[in-house]
UniProtKB/Swiss-Prot annotation:
Entries under PANTHER family matching the protein: 60S RIBOSOMAL PROTEIN L12, LARGE RIBOSOMAL SUBUNIT PROTEIN UL11M
Disulfide bonds: none
Organism ancestry: Bacteria, Pseudomonadati, Campylobacterota, Epsilonproteobacteria, Nautiliales
Protein's organism: Nitratiruptor sp. (strain SB155-2)
Post-translational modifications: One or more lysine residues are methylated.
Protein name per UniProt: Large ribosomal subunit protein uL11
Molecular function per GO: large ribosomal subunit rRNA binding; structural constituent of ribosome
Length: 141
């Protein structure tokens, strides 16, 4: 018999840096999950993605056990790293804050493919290019 799902929720946690402080501790504690067990498992799974915030979907079962699925880092984090900037433009139509190449765009699209609602690389590149435009990042050849 399958375990009954009690709750499912999403968090964004820095890779390899999950600890019992907010937002992780309160989110797990109020659902009765062993916080340290989650932190150890998450940190072990994400230690190779350091420097990114990792979206994670946590499913809690009736016996207080849990499973979690990590997603790819947000497209904006990948774009900021590729462009070498700290944050996007406050006015992306007028102020361009960085540039990325077509090759970098394709690499980001390939990385994000499992999380995007497309299986076509060209469509994924267009989605990422839209994120670039809204951040004030130019795409150059």
């Amino acid at each position: 018999m399958a375990k009954k799902v009690v709750d499912q929720f999403k968090l964004q946690i820095p890779a390899g840096k999950a600890n019992p402080s907010p937002p992780v501790g309160p989110a797990l504690g109020q659902r009765g999950v062993n916080i340290m067990e989650f932190c150890k498992a998450f940190n072990e799974k994400t230690k190779d993605m350091m420097g990114f915030n990792i979206p994670v979907v946590i499913t809690v079962y009736s016996d207080r056990s849990f499973t979690f699925v990590t997603k790819q880092p947000p497209a904006t984090d990948l774009i900021k790293k590729a462009a070498g900037i700290q944050k996007g433009s406050d006015n992306p139509l007028k102020n361009k804050v960085g540039k990325i190449t077509q090759a970098q765009l394709e690499e980001i699209a390939k990385t994000k493919m499992p999380d995007l609602n497309t299986t076509d690389l060209e469509a994924a590149k267009r989605i990422i290019a839209g994120s670039c435009r809204s951040m004030g990042v130019e795409i150059v050849d």
